[in-house]
Each structure stands twice: as structure tokens, then as C-alpha cells.
Amino acid sequence: MSVGMGVDLEAFRKSQRADGFASILAIGTANPPNVVDQSTYPDYYFRNTNNEDNTDLKDKFKRICERSAIKKRHMYLTEEILKKNPELCAFLEVPSLDTRQAMLAVEVPRLGKEAAEKAIEEWGQPKSRITHLIFCTTTTPDLPGADFEVAKLLGLHPSVKRVGVFQHGCFAGGTVLRLAKDLAENNRGARVLVVCSENTAVTFRGPSETHLDGLVGLALFGDGAAALIVGADPIPQVEKPCFEIVWTAQTVVPNSDGAISGKLREVGLTFQLKGAVPDLISTNIEKCLVEAFSQFNISDWNQLFWIAHPGGRAILDQVEASLNLDPTKLRATRHVMSEYGNMSSACVHFILDETRKASRQNGCSTSGGGFQMGVLFGFGPGLTVETVVLKSIPFP
């Protein structure tokens, strides 16, 4: 097909496409400096929400925290902030959305910027080479969005093409990889900055006897941001890829309506989590694996390196048991959960970072612990599952 002056549109179309798979070229992470110890968090939480007299509920919360397999978490909300903003410590009695959003509008982009600067530094290329920005958060719905704010904070060129991924929840760490792959492979020379930034100020509130799933969330979630540089056809000896993004998919688990959900209200984001979630994920995950890896003639799930969203200890335990996984497969996932809790969309990128670093420290032959192929799973509201097939990079 040709148009005016002999321009070949088909050749032009092909010239816009990259030759190879999208690669993750750099990873950066960031957390607030405030650290809460899980062993003392029940005392801290019930003291700051003025519920110390509710000893029965506090004991339940202690048991939830003890079973969480989490050692510590990072949180923006400090004791000082909570004292200045007591409406955050009520359950559902006092409107607090304005207070929350005033904090989140500043802190979510700020922490995202911190992670992005680390990724850009590792990448080693000028910011002017960034062509696209994907910004993901489940916390702030302002217009213009946090994507706009972080682009300003970083000083990105006004022509950078921005995509906002908002209100997706925990599965979105996979979503942004799917989007970044499509952008990088369909725009030759594109370099995509991916940023996920999450903050529990949107969900923090006082306890309730009638909403124990809310207590589960309060025991699991932490604050964090992760950033990636994604691009196809890395420049030899200049860019140093750590993983290739080979294939992606998204699906909704059958009969899972309402299993994980959140509602943004005047009191912030309320959280609902049904006890059936670990069963729903563990009984459906093999279907996702078969769909993803049958095309590569892989059926032994222990021959993969694993990056699984740490939705909670029960989910990881049941996935491990249902697939007969070697305990080492989820070691990086469990480590990140232990050190940071569930940071929603940012979690899987922390696990990617941990996997490549541990692989090098342990003398493995590839960034995937010595394995060539790997899987990344995101689980979240819907119940939605994101599946990403990754290829590791051999270490020199």
C-alpha cells in the first residue's frame, strides 16, 4: 500500500515495530522511613485508635499478625500524623476522605519519584530517552493524576506519553508489565518508565467487631513504590537487561465475584476480603500455568523461577501445596512479604529485584536463580489474575 510521493505505509508500519522482546532494563524501589514491627503493631494500632479497652478484639488482631509471616512493614502514617488527624482512627463514623487525599496527592507521587530516580540511575541513560510513563496506584483519584505529578517531579519532557493505571489493586503489578511490553514492542526505540506507588493511608481506620476482614488488611498491607525501565532491543554494552517479558495474559477466576473488593467512600477505601480467596487462587492457578507454558513445552512448574504476588501467607501456602512446588520457589516472595508486607501493585517488582540480586549473590548462572523461564503472577480484585512469562538473562 502506497500513498502520496511513493510513501510505503506497510514498510512504515513495520519500521515502527521492535525486533525483539521487551526487556526490564532497570529496577528501583523505595519505602517510607517509618518502620512498624509486626510483633508490637497490635499494641501500637489499638493505642493510636483509642481502642485499648477492647481486649478481645485486640487479641484477635494479635493472632492475625502472628500468623501473617510478616516481620515488619513501612508506613507513611506515623503516630504523630495519627494524633494530628484523629478522623483517620475512627472506623466508619467520621468522614476522612479529604484528609486522606490531601496526604496521598503529595506522598504517592513523591515516593514514586524516589523509586524512579533509582531505576533511572541504574539504567544509566538520560531521562530524555524516556518516551512513555505508566503510573499505577490504588490510592489517589485526583485530576490531573499522579502520572502527571510524577512526570513533573522527575522533569520528564512534556511529550512523554503517559498512561494511568488506577484503582486496580494487587494484580496491577502484572498489568503494567503487559502494557509496557505492548508499548515497547510496538514503538521502536521506546523506553517505558513504569512506576507503582502505594500508600495505606487510604485504608487505615479503627477496628470493628463486625468487619474482621478489615483487620486482616490492616495486618497485611504496607507502603512502597517500585519503578522499572522497560524497552526492546537493548543497546549492547550500554543497557543491561535483567529479564525479558515473553508473554502476558489476564483472566478472571470463575465464581469469584466479590472475593476481593474495595469501595471508595467518605471514610476512605473500605476493604472486603472473603475467606475463600486462597482456595479460589490455588484451585485455578494451574489452568493459568498450562495456558502460559504449553506453548513452550513446559509442564514442570519446578523448572520455573517464581514471582508471585504475596497476597497473604494462606495463599502462598495453598499455591505451594496444590502445585507441589519446592519451597525454594516462593523464597523470594516470602522474603519480600516478611520484610515489607503486601505493598499491592509494587510487590511483584520488589520480588523481581530480590530474585535477581539473590541469584547473583548465590552464584547462579541466570537472573532467575539458574532457571531460564519464569512466571510472574498478580492476584487482586475481580478476582483477577495477571500471568506474565519471563525469560531470565545469563550472568556473564
From Swiss-Prot:
Optimum pH is 6-7. The record marks 313 as: Responsible for the different enzymatic properties of STS1 and STS2. Induction: By stress. The active site is at 170. Its main location: cytoplasm. Catalyzes the production of pinosylvin from cinnamoyl-CoA and malonyl-CoA, and dihydropinosylvin from dihydrocinnamoyl-CoA. This is Pinosylvin synthase 2. It comes from Pinus strobus (Eastern white pine). The gene is STS2.
